[in-house]
């Protein structure tokens, strides 16, 4: 018997071609899940989430994996366009996805929603006010919806990550920079990036029956950079 068993589970992964998507799909598949990897844009089409779920068919797990490059803007230079664009990518899809998947999960009497978020919502970072606010909204949504749906056997949780190896936020050109390596040693107790597989295996655990007891939880995965 293995702790993480996803045999017979259908998992829908959004934005599966960027950020943690490839690693998540690979690890979930290796643990027996039937992975539906979707790559459509959820930010610009308000009906994309509904169409995505309709195309996927019944899903046991929604992995709400949303990413956008983080603006590096001084707070007094943040414009409305930047604010709206980041929230459109990271926050607006969540209620649309919930409307699309929750009714069927409720009818079946079980389901899971896992949001892949950011630890930037847990610890302040300079010049990231827009991005951190949007990531914080994701986590607040998870906590509220997790409590709302718990009695219906639908678990809603989040990973809040930073310093995890991925091509969107830590491409190879960043990782080889001596200044970045020095930053790792100074800021991250682990002293290295969390590997993509380490992160994906933890996500897989949260998608499994072994994690049925977690309700609206936010789990930092950041090598100790953030812990609350």
Predicted regions and their residues:
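Catalytic loop of short-chain dehydrogenase/reductase
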Residues: 112-137, 142-151, 163-164
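A short, exposed helix-loop element centered on a Lys and neighboring polar residues
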Residues: 98-99, 143
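Canonical Rossmann dinucleotide-binding motif of NAD(H)/NADP(H)-dependent dehydrogenases/reductases
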Residues: 3-36
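A glycine/serine/threonine-rich, flexible loop-to-helix segment
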Residues: 151, 163-187
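Short C-terminal tail/terminal secondary-structure segment
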Residues: 2, 123, 204, 215-228
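Alpha-helical segment proximal to the catalytic Tyr-Lys
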Residues: 103, 147-151, 212
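Substrate-binding pocket helix/loop in short-chain dehydrogenase/reductase
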Residues: 73-75, 79-87, 180, 184
């Amino acid at each position: 018997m293995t702790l993480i068993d996803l045999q017979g589970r259908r998992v829908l992964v959004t934005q599966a071609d960027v950020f943690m998507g490839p690693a998540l799909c690979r690890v979930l598949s290796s643990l027996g899940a039937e992975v539906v990897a979707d790559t459509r844009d959820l930010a610009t089409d308000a009906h994309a989430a509904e169409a995505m779920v309709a195309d996927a068919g019944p899903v046991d797990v929604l992995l709400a994996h949303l990413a956008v490059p983080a603006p590096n803007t001084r707070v007094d230079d943040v414009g409305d366009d930047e604010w709206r664009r980041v929230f459109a990518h990271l926050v607006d899809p969540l209620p649309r996805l919930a409307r699309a998947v929750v009714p069927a999960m409720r009818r079946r009497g079980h389901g899971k929603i896992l949001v892949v978020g950011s630890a930037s919502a847990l610890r302040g970072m300079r010049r990231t006010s827009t991005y951190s606010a949007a990531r914080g909204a994701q986590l607040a949504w998870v906590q509220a919806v997790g409590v709302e749906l718990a009695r219906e056997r639908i678990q809603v949780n989040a990973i809040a990550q930073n310093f995890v190896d991925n091509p969107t936020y830590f491409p190879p050109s960043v990782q080889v920079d001596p200044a970045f390596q020095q930053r790792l040693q100074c800021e991250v107790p682990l002293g290295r990036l969390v590997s993509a597989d380490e992160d994906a295996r933890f996500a897989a655990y949260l998608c499994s029956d072994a994690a049925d007891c977690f309700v609206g939880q936010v789990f930092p995965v950041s090598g100790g950079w953030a812990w609350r």
